[in-house]
């Protein structure tokens, strides 16, 4: 069994494709076929997964299809439809010291350069212009905020990320 923090959902198994056990694949990776860079997959729902290896894959109509080891028939393929595809966190490439996976930033305290605690990173998302941190404000926030959205702009807004202390220092006006 895996703990949620030890695994990452990278995609989902879709409907059967044909009668020989092929399945459609939805990939959540930046590059559509990036999901195939990771092996084995942990297929299932949180806490109830099994390792599966991709035998073959190809693009099909702007999507992906794959033949998985042990999935031989349409019925086999139907039995895994809509299951998550996860990988172990250790399978991700190592990043340089000043680079971070978003999952590492979630849960960190965000503090201004003046020492004001803005709250905890709840999630990050893309806007097209730049990435944004959604911060859950402290219950007794002096400015009455429940949540804040702060751009994740290295050097301009984000001044320092401290993995050990689990803090992100920002140049940001807490009243905004």
Swiss-Prot record:
Protein family (similarity comment): Belongs to the RimM family.
UniProt main location, coarse: cytoplasm
GO molecular function: ribosome binding
PANTHER family: RIBOSOME MATURATION FACTOR RIMM
NCBIfam families: 16S_RimM (TIGR02273)
Subunit structure as annotated in this protein's UniProt entry: Binds ribosomal protein uS19.
UniProt superkingdom: Bacteria
Domain notes: The PRC barrel domain binds ribosomal protein uS19.
Keyword vocabulary terms for this entry: Chaperone, Cytoplasm, Ribosome biogenesis, rRNA processing
Positions of the PRC barrel domain: 97-176
Location within or outside the cell: Cytoplasm
Its job: An accessory protein needed during the final step in the assembly of 30S ribosomal subunit, possibly for assembly of the head region. Essential for efficient processing of 16S rRNA. May be needed both before and after RbfA during the maturation of 16S rRNA. It has affinity for free ribosomal 30S subunits but not for 70S ribosomes.
An example Gene Ontology biological process: ribosomal small subunit biogenesis
UniProt key word rRNA processing: yes
KW Transport (keyword) present: no
Gene3D superfamilies per the UniProt record, alphabetical: PRC-barrel domain, RimM
GO CC entries: cytoplasm; ribosome
Name listed for the protein in its UniProt record: Ribosome maturation factor RimM
InterPro entries recorded: PRC-brl_dom, PRC_barrel-like_sf, RimM, RimM_N, RimM_N_sf, Transl_B-barrel_sf
